[in-house]
């Protein structure tokens, strides 16, 4: 039905079926209709295979937005690091245990007044508990919402702040 008459600018999908057939069908529809796919998923492997650009969201807020290659090679938000670190790896010696992000998700009824990730973030500051960080372009086409990005230092994964 989609191919035979609907004019869509975006095809929304949660990719409930992760099989090759679902991915192939979405790619075919995208090509045939010259349109975009809005893919909503927690499966970062699917993101790598299917997406040109990625918007990472946490508790309803965008925390990072960039092209897929940059996200995987230079993630800049602590939540993104946690997501990428939680992906199973062939070289992983965790003996089947997946890494997790410490802490608990926020109460969504109380969001909007601070960074939603502050209680799970190893780099939390007082600013994080006082206001929602703005989405800032930290490199051309790479946007991050983190109070630590507003400093003159570059936040490095797992190493704290480094002087530029």
Per-segment meaning from a language model:
Residues 67-164:
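Charged, flexible cofactor/metal-binding loops and thiol motifs
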């Amino acid at each position: 039905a989609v191919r035979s008459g609907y004019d869509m600018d975006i095809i929304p999908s949660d990719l409930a079926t992760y099989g090759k057939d679902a991915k192939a069908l979405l790619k075919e529809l995208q090509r045939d209709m010259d349109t975009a796919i809005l893919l909503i998923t927690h499966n970062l492997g699917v993101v790598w295979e299917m997406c040109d650009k990625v918007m990472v969201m946490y508790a309803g807020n965008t925390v990072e937005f960039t092209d897929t290659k940059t996200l995987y090679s230079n993630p800049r938000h602590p939540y993104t690091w946690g997501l990428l670190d939680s992906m199973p790896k062939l070289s992983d010696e965790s003996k089947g245990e997946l890494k997790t992000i410490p802490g608990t998700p926020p109460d969504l009824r109380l969001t909007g007044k601070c960074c939603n990730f502050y209680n799970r973030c190893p780099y939390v500051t007082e600013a994080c508990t006082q206001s929602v960080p703005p989405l800032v372009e930290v490199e051309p086409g790479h946007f991050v919402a983190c109070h630590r990005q507003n400093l003159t230092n570059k936040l490095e994964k797992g190493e704290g702040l480094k002087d530029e």
